[in-house]
Amino acid sequence: MVCRNVSRQQFRAIMIITSLLDTDLYKFSMMQVVLHHFPAAQVEYRYKCRTPGVNLRPYLDEIRAEVHELCQLRFTSEELDYLRGLRFIKSDFVDFLGLFHLPERCIFIGEGEQPGEISITVKGPWLHTILFEIPVLAIVNEVYFRNTRRNPDWEEGRKRLQSKMNLVLDDPALADFRVAEYGTRRRFSKVWHEEIVSTMKARMGVHFAGTSNVLLAMRHGVLPLGTMGHEYLQACQALGPRLRDSQVFALEVWAKEYRGDLGIALSDVYGMDAFLRDFDMYFCKLFDGARHDSGDPFVWGERLLEHYRANRADPRAKTLVFSDSLTFPRAIELARQFAGRCKVSFGIGTNLTNDLGHEPLQIVMKMVRCNGQPVAKVSDAPEKTMCDDPAYLAYLRQVFQLPPA
């Protein structure tokens, strides 16, 4: 996979990812569940660029070189000590991470089917491949932008960031507003990412809830944030007792692992209707709240609050987390809509870490198979549905009583 005409010294000189902590917290929270409950699971992930007309092929060798160096990384003693200090991380998991590295044999990078496309597939044990997604996407982004935007307008980026922060800082009615940075995978560069976090910490005070990036949380002394991602619920389609019960199974295993900690449930793997059918009184009272990641956030929030009331759970004690393509103005609208009715929190990604005046890439890497079986996400936004088996997708829709695509 490595480009043979570039020396190892040159590889190290251009490394984008220099720490295995340079990823999102929810990867570690899910990975711990995998270690304890599904250590033998085999999975496949596939990369997709949703932005039309992007030509990444000229940069294939650079991407391969960066991924090669990623696979040489190990956790340092300082990093392991930091993880050990997180209340929900168990000692045997940290011991495992002390032996961990990303297996280069499990990632395949080549040309895609369409002009300019590249293909990235990860295939292997879930426990050993789960940490590929975030750094690989960050690599693709940074390689692309350092070649196509050689002179970034940093001052424009800083101006945009300050104007966003001012929307909150200048409004006394937003005293309880909390926002987190969620932008690792689509960041313009790691240097810009770090500036965003350090600036928000310095200027936003209590309004800055933290970051999903574990390395930056450690460096800057802010809270690392995250619970579960789509891949966890998708994998449970293949790991649970039967497909119809897979969402309940996933939530029950999560509760068994964390015993009430990390209590934000993800709602959109099967759409909101299916989520509410499964999120019964037990889960309403057990979990701290839920995360919105597709569909109309205002409708979603109102439905969830009504569902809590119907299940005798006080919405004012619950947290609604919004993270779907958020901007500061939209987050502020949502904060006003639900003020005094529940707790709200916001995770803003691309609009923070890749807003320097050009179009960011819309790239994803999603799980498509687990234990040889197709898996799928059928969200409240049709364009986010990703599955390589139409027959399975149709069956999934039937089982969860979802409308046809």
Curated annotation (Swiss-Prot):
Transmembrane segments: none annotated. Transiently phosphorylated on a His residue during the reaction cycle. Phosphorylation strongly increases the affinity for substrates and increases the rate of nicotinate D-ribonucleotide production. Dephosphorylation regenerates the low-affinity form of the enzyme, leading to product release. InterPro entries: N/Namide_PRibTrfase, NAPRTase_N, Nic_PRibTrfase, Nic_PRibTrfase-Fam, Nicotinate_pribotase-like_C. SUPFAM superfamilies: Nicotinate/Quinolinate PRTase C-terminal domain-like, Nicotinate/Quinolinate PRTase N-terminal domain-like. GO terms for molecular function: nicotinate phosphoribosyltransferase activity. Pathway: Cofactor biosynthesis; NAD(+) biosynthesis; nicotinate D-ribonucleotide from nicotinate: step 1/1. It catalyses: nicotinate + 5-phospho-alpha-D-ribose 1-diphosphate + ATP + H2O = nicotinate beta-D-ribonucleotide + ADP + phosphate + diphosphate. One of its GO terms (cellular component) is cytosol. GO terms for biological process: NAD biosynthetic process via the salvage pathway. Keywords: Ligase, Phosphoprotein, Pyridine nucleotide biosynthesis. CDD domains: PncB_like (cd01401). Its EC number is 6.3.4.21. The modification Phosphohistidine is found at H230. Belongs to the NAPRTase family. NCBIfam families: NAPRTase, PRK05321.1. Catalyzes the synthesis of beta-nicotinate D-ribonucleotide from nicotinate and 5-phospho-D-ribose 1-phosphate at the expense of ATP. This is Nicotinate phosphoribosyltransferase. It comes from Bordetella parapertussis (strain 12822 / ATCC BAA-587 / NCTC 13253). The gene is pncB.
